[in-house]
Amino acid sequence: MFLLYEYDIFWAFLIISSAIPVLAFLISGVLSPIRKGPEKLSSYESGIEPIGDAWLQFRIRYYMFALVFVVFDVETVFLYPWAMSFDVLGVSAFLEAFIFVLILILGLVYAWRKGALEWS
């Protein structure tokens, strides 16, 4: 028998966790001062007057490093639950995880060969 009251705690958590950020934005909007002076409109750079233009174009190299980092960070997130239940899953899960890591290593070698990891 499927009973919906089993999910009451889930819905309560979902509503509360959605309401907290909305309330935080509403309260900060109501309580914050609206006056905009010259100091508030100026750009801030570590307590020093900014030198040059505030809008700089970043090289694509930074994005490639960030992309490779995100890929391997997500790999860690996927492999952690597998590592915690390694003894229960057996050989087939080990082979699947091995193939997953092998594909990621091949991707890293490809990015390395293409020069995506070169800093200069």
UniProtKB/Swiss-Prot annotation:
Main location: plastid
Record-level GO BP terms: photosynthesis, light reaction
UniProt-listed Gene3D superfamilies: NADH:ubiquinone/plastoquinone oxidoreductase, chain 3 (1.20.58.1610)
Keywords: Chloroplast, Membrane, NAD, NADP, Plastid, Plastoquinone, Quinone, Thylakoid, Translocase, Transmembrane, Transmembrane helix, Transport
Residue spans crossing the bilayer: 9-29, 64-84, 88-108
Known role: NDH shuttles electrons from NAD(P)H:plastoquinone, via FMN and iron-sulfur (Fe-S) centers, to quinones in the photosynthetic chain and possibly in a chloroplast respiratory chain. The immediate electron acceptor for the enzyme in this species is believed to be plastoquinone. Couples the redox reaction to proton translocation, and thus conserves the redox energy in a proton gradient.
PANTHER family: NADH-UBIQUINONE OXIDOREDUCTASE CHAIN 3
Membrane topology: Multi-pass membrane protein
The enzyme's E.C. designation: 7.1.1.-
Self-association and partners: NDH is composed of at least 16 different subunits, 5 of which are encoded in the nucleus.
Catalytic class of the enzyme: translocase
Annotated protein name in UniProt: NAD(P)H-quinone oxidoreductase subunit 3, chloroplastic
Keyword match Nucleotide-binding: no
Cystine pairs: none
